[in-house]
Structures are given as structure tokens and as C-alpha cells.
From Swiss-Prot:
It catalyses: GTP + H2O = GDP + phosphate + H(+). Interacts with AFDN, the C-terminal domain of RALGDS and RLF, but not with RIN1 and PIK3CA. RLF binds exclusively to the active GTP-bound form. Strongly interacts with BRAF, but only weakly with RAF1. BARF and RAF1 association is dependent upon the GTP-bound state. Interacts with RGL3. GO terms for cellular component: plasma membrane. CDD domains: Rit_Rin_Ric. Plays a crucial role in coupling NGF stimulation to the activation of both EPHB2 and MAPK14 signaling pathways and in NGF-dependent neuronal differentiation. Involved in ELK1 transactivation through the Ras-MAPK signaling cascade that mediates a wide variety of cellular functions, including cell proliferation, survival, and differentiation. Signal peptide: none annotated. It comes from Mus musculus. GO terms for biological process: Ras protein signal transduction. It is an enzyme of class 3 (hydrolase). Keywords: Cell membrane, GTP-binding, Hydrolase, Membrane, Nucleotide-binding. Belongs to the small GTPase superfamily. Ras family. Expressed in many tissues. This is GTP-binding protein Rit1.
Length: 219
């Protein structure tokens, strides 16, 4: 993976800069490790001390399945309340990573609130989502089983990962999976539009075919 992280607003004249940009949004209760996951993905480092996030944005250029991708990642605060700013980035976001901590059952219950928030703003259940149970290295403090996470992911029809931001377990997989989900949805949309655009048989063609079959049966 390229470590080409660059600050917001910087310019880049390389051809890869013109590749597809994916707007990803991190959601989840406070303290579940959203910022640590993002920083591990962007810069391969784990922040030992980190102030609670208000809102941070990161950009990185990578390749996923041999296709270039410019990721624009928004790391949000840990509240599910509706605000005008949240409405704005929920509409602009193309895919969402909803995180909870396996050591905090309350954060797991709040996952549904964030999923409902996505629906409330976008009015569709078809938005690409990846569900993440973070802090998998703290097994002795586990409050949420892996089976519960898998069950909720099946309900959401989305990929699921248990991660460790501290040890960088499955961090890349989460972001790559979300980009794949976005690409899959885009391909499905293109196919649906192409199918809709195909010319249908005329009324006369549909009327003639039973007559033709009847005539053939008589002869």
C-alpha cells in the first residue's frame, strides 16, 4: 500500500491525482478507536494519547484491486445527534464505516442509531457500509461476542471485521472492503441503467408472435 497521505488542500499534479475519489465517513460512539484506526491506515502509527475528535479529514492515494483510488476520509465525533454539519457530510459521503468497541456493549447498541441516521439523511438502505468491532486485542475485556457482530452485519447486509487499531489487525481490509462495496454498487447501478435503456419489443411484435405460433401449428 502506498503511504501517500497528503493534507487537505494540497495540490498534486500526477495522473493518479485525477483518479476516482471516494468520500468515506467514520461513524461510531466516542472512544471506540475511530481516529486510531484512521491514523493506522494513513500513517501506520498508533496514537498513544489522542484528544477526543471533533472532526478530522485525511486524504490518501492507494491502489485497491490494481485500480487507483483517492480516499477522502472524514473522522467524526462520537455522537449520533442530528446537526446541520452532520447532515452535510452524511449526504456527501459515499460509504460509511460504523465502529464499536468489543469491550463496550453500549457502543455496540449505538451502532443501530448510526445506521438509522444514515437512512434518515439518505432515505435508502442501499448505502455502502462496513461494520467494525475494534479493540479485538483486548480479549479479556470483551463484552460483545464476534457472533453478535456477524449477526448484525447480516442484518445490515454488509461486510464485518473485528480489528485492532493497536496492532493494525485488519485495518487495511476495512477501508478496502468499503471501496469495493462502493464500486460494486456503482456497477449494479450502471447495469440497471443499461438494462432500462435497452429498446423493448414493440406492441406489434408482441401481438404477432402468438399469431405466428398459431399459424405454424395449423400448417
Amino acid at each position: 500500500m502506498e503511504s501517500g497521505a497528503r493534507p487537505i488542500g494540497s495540490s498534486c499534479s500526477s495522473p493518479a491525482a485525477l483518479s476516482r475519489e471516494y468520500k468515506l465517513v467514520m461513524l461510531g460512539a466516542g472512544g471506540v478507536g475511530k481516529s486510531a484506526m484512521t491514523m493506522q491506515f494513513i500513517s501506520h502509527r498508533f496514537p498513544e494519547d489522542h484528544d477526543p475528535t471533533i472532526e478530522d479529514a485525511y486524504k490518501i492515494r492507494i491502489r485497491i484491486d490494481d485500480e487507483p483510488a483517492n480516499l477522502d476520509i472524514l473522522d467524526t465525533a462520537g455522537q449520533a445527534e442530528f446537526t446541520a454539519m452532520r447532515d452535510q457530510y452524511m449526504r456527501a459521503g459515499e460509504g460509511f464505516i460504523i465502529c464499536y468497541s468489543i469491550t463496550d456493549r453500549r457502543s455496540f447498541h449505538e451502532v443501530r442509531e448510526f445506521k438509522q441516521l444514515i437512512y434518515r439523511v439518505r432515505r435508502t438502505d442501499d448505502t455502502p457500509v462496513v461494520l467494525v468491532g475494534n479493540k479485538s486485542d483486548l480479549k479479556q475485556l470483551r463484552q460483545v461476542s464476534k457472533e453478535e457482530g456477524l449477526s448484525l452485519a447480516r442484518e445490515f447486509s454488509c461486510p464485518f471485521f473485528e480489528t485492532s487499531a493497536a496492532y493494525r489487525y485488519y485495518i487495511d481490509d476495512v477501508f478496502h472492503a468499503l471501496v469495493r462495496e462502493i464500486r460494486k454498487k456503482e456497477k449494479e447501478l450502471v447495469l440497471a441503467m443499461e438494462k432500462k435503456a435497452k429498446p423493448k419489443n414493440s406492441v406489434w411484435k408482441r401481438l404477432k408472435s402468438p399469431f405466428r405460433r398459431k399459424k405454424d401449428s395449423v400448417t
